[in-house]
Amino acid sequence: MSKNKLVAYAVSMLVVMNQLSGCSTLEKPVENKTVAPPQFEPFIRLSDEAFGFVGSLRRPTDRVLGSTVLIGSNVALTAAHCLIDSDISYVEFAGNKYEIDYTVCYEVGSYRNHDIGLVFLTQDVIGVDPVGRVDDVLGSIKKWDYVTTIGYSRGFKKASSLSTFRYYGVLYNEENQIKMLPNRGSIWFGDSGGGLFWFGDNGFELIGIIVSFSKMEGFIVENSSIRVDCYEGWIDYEIEKNKLLNSQTE
C-alpha cells in the first residue's frame, strides 16, 4: 500500500473512532475567575414617557428648572420654591409641552413653612393618567418602608432604586414633612417638585413632593418631602375653584 493511501486510511479510521466514541475535540481548560458583584445603582434613568405623571418645569431655554406631578387632568403639584421668582416657561409631560394657565402657592409669596404649590394648565394632559394620592401617610406607612423618588435632577428623568430610600417618619414641629434616609444616593437640584411614592394596597401612590436635602460635615444625611395628605383640603378647594373659572369662560 502506498504511503499516501496509508495516511488516508489512518485519518479515516480516526474519524470513525471519534464518531463511535462520541468524543469531540478537547478545549483548553479555562481558569476560574472571580466575577465581580453587580454595582449598586441608586437611580435608574427613565424615558420621559415612563411614569408619565411625573413631568418637568422648563425654562424659556428648554432647560429643566424642576419637576412636577400630575394629580388631575390639567393640574400638577410641585415645590413652591420652583414657582416663586423663577423663570418657568412651560410644563412638559411625557415629552409634550403644555402652556401654564396660572400657578398658586399655599403660602403666598413664600415657601418657608409650606413649600408646596399647584400648576394649572390651559389644556388637559393627553395620554397620561394622573397619579393617586395616599390620604393618610401616618396611618399607612411604617418606619423603614421602601419609598421611591422620581424627578429630573441633572437634566434627565430618573427613579430611585428600591433600596435607595427608606421612610423614616415625621418630626415634631415639622409634621407637614416626610423624612427619608438616603442609601448611597440622594435627591439633587432638579428633583424639587418631583414625587415621593409608596407602593401600598392601592398600588403606586403619591405621598410627598420633593423639596430639600440636609448636609452635615459635607455629607447628605436626610432628604425631605412635603406631605401631600396635609394639604388635601387646600388642593381640592383650588381644583374646584379652577373648574368654576373654566366653566365661566366656556
Q: Where are the regions a protein language model picked out?
A:
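C-terminal subregion of chymotrypsin/trypsin-like serine protease catalytic domains
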Residues: 24-36, 71-76, 168-169, 188, ...
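Chymotrypsin/trypsin-fold serine protease catalytic domain
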Residues: 112-186, 212-238
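Short hydrophobic-aromatic micro-motifs
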Residues: 75-79, 119
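Classical Sec-dependent N-terminal signal peptides that target proteins to the secretory pathway
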Residues: 2-25
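Short, surface-exposed secondary-structure boundary micro-motifs
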Residues: 79-81, 152, 201
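A conserved glycine-rich beta-strand in the N-terminal activation segment of trypsin-fold
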Residues: 52-73, 193
